[in-house]
Amino acid sequence: MSRFLQAEINLKSLIHNFSKIKAHLRNTRVSCKIIAIVKADAYGHGAVEVARVFGLLGVDYLGVAFSEEAIVLREAGIKVPIIVLFDREIEGVFKYNLIPVIFDYRQAEFLSKEASRRGVILPVHIKVETGMGRLGIYENPCETIKKIAQLDNLKIDGVMSHFSRAEDLEWTQEQMKKFSKIREFLHNLGMKPLFHIANSQGLNYKEALFDAVRPGLMLYGYGAEGFIPCMTVKTKLLDIRKLPKGTPISYGGTFVTKKDSLIGVIPVGYADGYFRSLSNKAEVIVRGKRVPVVGTVCMDLTMIDLTDIQEVQIDDEVILLGKTGSEEITASHIAQWAGTIPYEVLTSFGGRARRKYIMEEEE
């Protein structure tokens, strides 16, 4: 029998989160399109299944990082318009009807020539730099967009930017100010593409909503009150060992039993996205109770202290991420223990875990 490591994705929770964002936009009295971000395999949740759900819910666009991600969706039958955020690859753009994001003039010229050669009009979005310091047109963005608009066979459907610290009101307002000036300039020229800058945290600012929003983490249950995490990661106890006081556990003996102890072994390690930095810090749930991770997390195995759990047995379920009864371990908890962010936690679990999709109401 193969080892059990399962990422359970609750599509009911996904639907709840998407609907909550739509309700927020409606209550804010803003008519906004939604660009659902499904890059990195939908943050580890499985892009194809997640995109299908969003398509049924009437999402306006999907957003991916690279063309290869979009091609997987197209070949799975996803028809929703797909924006490719960070790529210069062109073959997939034309073959699979994708919308590339342009982040410099040279890229725009190249796409224009290719579109002209193929005899098609290519819809594009343009990224402008407002404070992220990563990708985007940063020198004379207004004039550069004006020049791009004059290129053959390109249709500017959108202009975007990205918040670098949406939790910082002053900095975010400065970014919005720069973005608004570009929007005003283009409107004065009679150009009215779709403007979008708001990520999940940006939804908190009404003035950031513009013409579209790009929720990511929030869709998967994190970032604000009332959103429900969609992913549960579980495994089963591989072994249970009775060890005397003073026994060192795992590599380096970083944990030594302080009393006679019951130590469980689970078939999960850092190769599965369960970070080594969780050693002696994290907790998991066994039989409805939290128990600590002890010793160094190994490549394929992790040890947990079961001393206080009654009648525990081999093959008992172990919750690494998720809720059971009154106990819950979230990606935010794991991120805090590991010294990282929830995004990294969710995207790291997808590698060797088998996914199972369910439709269940949250208890």
UniProtKB/Swiss-Prot annotation:
Amino-acid positions noted as binding substrate in the UniProt annotation, renumbered to this chain? 134, 299
One Pfam annotation, family name? Ala_racemase_N
UniProt xrefs under SUPFAM superfamilies? Alanine racemase C-terminal domain-like, PLP-binding barrel
Q: Which UniProt keywords apply?
A: Isomerase, Pyridoxal phosphate
- On this chain, the residues bearing N6-(pyridoxal phosphate)lysine are 39
Q: Which residues form the active site?
A: 39, 251
| Gene Ontology CC terms | cytosol
- Entry annotated with the keyword Isomerase: yes
Write out the GO MF terms: alanine racemase activity; pyridoxal phosphate binding
The EC number(s) attached to this protein equal: 5.1.1.1
The organism's place on the tree of life at top rank:
Bacteria
Cofactors named for this entry: pyridoxal 5'-phosphate
> Which BP terms from GO are recorded?
D-alanine biosynthetic process
InterPro entries membership: Ala_racemase, Ala_racemase/Decarboxylase_C, Ala_racemase_C, Ala_racemase_N, Ala_racemase_pyridoxalP-BS, PLP-binding_barrel
Named in its record, the pathway it takes part in is: Amino-acid biosynthesis; D-alanine biosynthesis; D-alanine from L-alanine: step 1/1
Give the first-level EC class, as a single word. Answer: isomerase
Catalytic reaction list: L-alanine = D-alanine
What HAMAP family has UniProt attached to this entry? Ala_racemase (MF_01201)
Q: What does this protein do?
A: Catalyzes the interconversion of L-alanine and D-alanine. May also act on other amino acids.
- Family label: Belongs to the alanine racemase family.
Stated name of the protein: Alanine racemase
* Lineage of the species this protein comes from: Bacteria, Pseudomonadati, Nitrospirota, Thermodesulfovibrionia, Thermodesulfovibrionales
Gene symbol here is alr
